Amino acid sequence: MTDMKIDRRQMLKLEAAAIAAAAAGMPSTSLAANLVTEREASELKWDKAACRFCGTGCSVMVATKDNRVVATHGDIKAEVNRGLNCVKGYFLSKIMYGHDRLTHPMLRKTNGKYDKNGEFTPVSWDEAFDIMALKFKDALKKRGPSGVGMFGSGQWTIWEGYAASKLFKAGFRTNNIDPNARHCMASAVAGMMRTFGIDEPAGCYDDIEAADAFVLWGSNMAEMHPILWTRVTDRRLSAPHVKVAVLSTFEHRSFDLADIGMVFKPQTDLYLLNAIANHIIKTGRVNKDFVQAHTVFKKGQTDIGYGLRPEHPLQKKATGAAKANDATDISFDEYAKFVSDYTLEKAAEMSGVPLNRLEALAELYADPKTKVVSFWTMGFNQHTRGVWCNNLVYNIHLLTGKIAEAGNSPFSLTGQPSACGTAREVGTFSHRLPADMVVTNKEHRTKAEHIWQLPEGTIPDKPGYHAVLQSRMLKDGLLNAYWVQVNNNLQAGPNANEETYPGFRNPDNFIVVSDAYPSVTALAADLILPTAMWVEKEGAYGNAERRTQFWHQLVSAPGEARSDLWQLMEFSKRFKIEEVWPEELIAKKPDVRGKTLFDVLYKNGQVDKFPLDQIEAGYANDESKAFGFYVHKGLFEEYAAFGRGHGHDLAPFEAYHKERGLRWPVVDGKETRWRFREGSDPYVKAGTGVQFYGFPDGKARIFALPYEPPAESPDKDYPFWLSTGRVVEHWHSGTMTRRVPELYKAFPEAVCFMHPDDAQEANLRRGDEVKVASRRGFIRARVETRGRDKPPRGLVFVPWFDESKLINKVTLDATDPISLQTDYKKCAVRIERV
């Protein structure tokens, strides 16, 4: 072993880093284990990559040896995490090496032939694509473009999502493609679009070091964004005047730092938000100059339903469901009158939060001297009125002018590593195109068709099936060929018993799942395709602060596993244009006759124009080698054409391999920290100060939106609220983290967190097994009354990482009618001893 000498200065740095690491859930000994990053000293090759897990976008240093990742540590050159990792990030080196890693395509067969009820049998890629192409062509003949679909991911790399969107929206001419970001970020997208006319946060992580107060709305940052939480903690502990307010339906680890901790009754966040706005108006703290110059007022459509099936009684009663996204102009006076009924006193009574705490919270926003950052995640977004929650928190920041400047920021935190970069920016949602364009807008479709070199009318003008609707259509037999990549929706989707699983096993359907491991979803499929993971391919993610980050391929995938990008592009070779486009469309561009979708979409003179010698020396690139050109650069530069000059500018391709990410818009080589603010955002006109240029009038919208009840509430038969969510040790459905021994042992199985008094009343003790049952299904779990999560009486919390306890058999598939995002935080259950 090579001797190392560490001087006093280095030792002090290590001690400081160890303290911060402990706050992130990482054992202090882990830091010393990964200190040596020079190849000469360690005989390892080190390179940078974006972390595979959450939307924080930490950069990590990855060590490889003999075609294997052997170590990782936080990247000290990264602005985001400054050398730190959370407990999941610390074990990144192990996520690719589970004992049951998939290495060959697997097709259900009986007696050598495909059989929906057969056993999984290894097959070649050719055989896998043959049966897959046959089933897709059958579905296209039977139902047209609506018969095929795809469910993708906020964990796709940017070019994987872009290639998938092209294949389905342009190739198969269907918008039936949606990412699992529909479950996590759709309400944030719709909220931004409604308020600002353009997507993604105005601020950045630099706001943390400039803020005087932090307000968390439905966000357990301590566990879900632990590295950002270390920065919030550092700010709070190093500046005595700084305050932290945390609002949630149950107490969790973020409450440990809270100066103002508030547990509110589910759904009453709507009431609280309006009450704060009313307080600002009543106490004369509206920033009148800002409001007059930069905002207009709207009254939103109400009684919009809950996104349930049309025959559901709640949908039948919803008078505004058909026009859920509509709004009409009102004046400031009309808005002030609307919120005047929402007093802090009534809010306290409605929510159960003590009045003095609500007053303290309202004053953080109202005091013009206090800079406030509002953070929120799934508590807001997974909500039947999630878009409204987003709009209402923007209202507060707009009324006070606390936006688009250092320390003043309403900030929706992203859950997945590229929910922003791939789902939102690339536009892999069923209604979107790149750079905030939508399929319903003819000008947007025309621009996309021009960049993609397609005949006019190629892209359909109606949104496709969104995530929840895909499950319903599969069940109903109206969506027959379906491809799932980089997600585990049978475990993650709501109401799994009634709405998700039936579609997978419908004999009329053919289900393909691309995954690295045999997940619950993969095991319910007809064909499993083995997938390359993380640094087994060249990649790019976009994080929550608009930061785009690249990494090189560092190792090869095992066996016959191939990247999702390779799968998409290789599969496209199986389709002649005549098999997927109507004759009248082909007639508009006759030179496509006889070509494959691969030729038209990916070997089109744009994507394939960069030769292999442009790949940086010393790095493998399996996808590019397979196709004969630098795939990633070609896809990226074509995609970047959508945003350049339109407020979504990306830097040249090579810049991202050199940098630890850049925050768009990147104009003349300079990234943007604060959008909409003159001097920071190059799109703001000189002399305007602030310009919300997403709308032609340059103004943001302030919405009058009421409290409306949840889709389902506790009653005598089902007396408890159920909320679901995550824990720091596991990522989403646990497909990766449960295969890391240290993370599995740290939290081996999901439990039912319950108030001790509720348990005592039911004659239950900690560790007893109970049935958590709703009107839709049940699971068994053990009671936890002394854990990190502390629900109030009448509410239980069950995390969803555990495939042996599929809590989404219990949840309700109600969605926000505007964003179409599922509410996983509120349904009614009963707790029974087993």
Curated annotation (Swiss-Prot):
Taxonomic superkingdom: Bacteria
Domain 4Fe-4S Mo/W bis-MGD-type: 44-100
Enzyme Commission code: 1.9.6.1
Gene Ontology biological process terms, A to Z: cellular respiration; Mo-molybdopterin cofactor biosynthetic process; nitrate assimilation
InterPro entries cross-referenced by the UniProt entry: Asp_de-COase-like_dom_sf, CT_Nitrate-R-NapA-like, MoPterin_dinucl-bd_dom, Mopterin_OxRdtase, Mopterin_OxRdtase_4Fe-4S_dom, MopterinOxRdtase_cofactor_BS, Periplasm_NO3_reductase_lsu, Prok_molybdopt-oxidoreductase
UniProt: Mo-bis(molybdopterin guanine dinucleotide) binding residues: 88, 155, 180, 184, 217-224, 248-252, 267-269, 378, 382, 488, 514-515, 537, 564, 724-733, 808, 825
Compartment(s): Periplasm
Keyword annotations from UniProtKB, A to Z: 4Fe-4S, Electron transport, Iron, Iron-sulfur, Metal-binding, Molybdenum, Nitrate assimilation, Oxidoreductase, Periplasm, Signal, Transport
Subunit structure: Component of the periplasmic nitrate reductase NapAB complex composed of NapA and NapB.
Catalysis: reaction(s): 2 Fe(II)-[cytochrome] + nitrate + 2 H(+) = 2 Fe(III)-[cytochrome] + nitrite + H2O
SMART domains xrefs: Molybdop_Fe4S4
Sequence similarity: Belongs to the prokaryotic molybdopterin-containing oxidoreductase family. NasA/NapA/NarB subfamily.
One Gene Ontology CC term in the entry: nitrate reductase complex
Co-factor remark: Binds 1 [4Fe-4S] cluster.
Binding residues for substrate: 800
Organism: Bradyrhizobium sp. (strain BTAi1 / ATCC BAA-1182)
Endpoints of the signal sequence: 1-32
Entry comment on modification after translation: Predicted to be exported by the Tat system. The position of the signal peptide cleavage has not been experimentally proven.
Leading EC class: oxidoreductase
Residues that, per the record, bind [4Fe-4S] cluster: 51, 54, 58, 86
GO molecular function: 4 iron, 4 sulfur cluster binding; electron transfer activity; iron ion binding; molybdenum ion binding; molybdopterin cofactor binding; nitrate reductase (cytochrome) activity
Protein name: Periplasmic nitrate reductase
PANTHER family in the cross-refs: PERIPLASMIC NITRATE REDUCTASE, RESPIRATORY NITRATE REDUCTASE
Main localization, broad class: periplasm
Job description of the protein: Catalytic subunit of the periplasmic nitrate reductase complex NapAB. Receives electrons from NapB and catalyzes the reduction of nitrate to nitrite.
Essential cofactor(s): [4Fe-4S] cluster; Mo-bis(molybdopterin guanine dinucleotide)
Entries under Pfam families matching the protein: Molybdop_Fe4S4, Molybdopterin, Molydop_binding
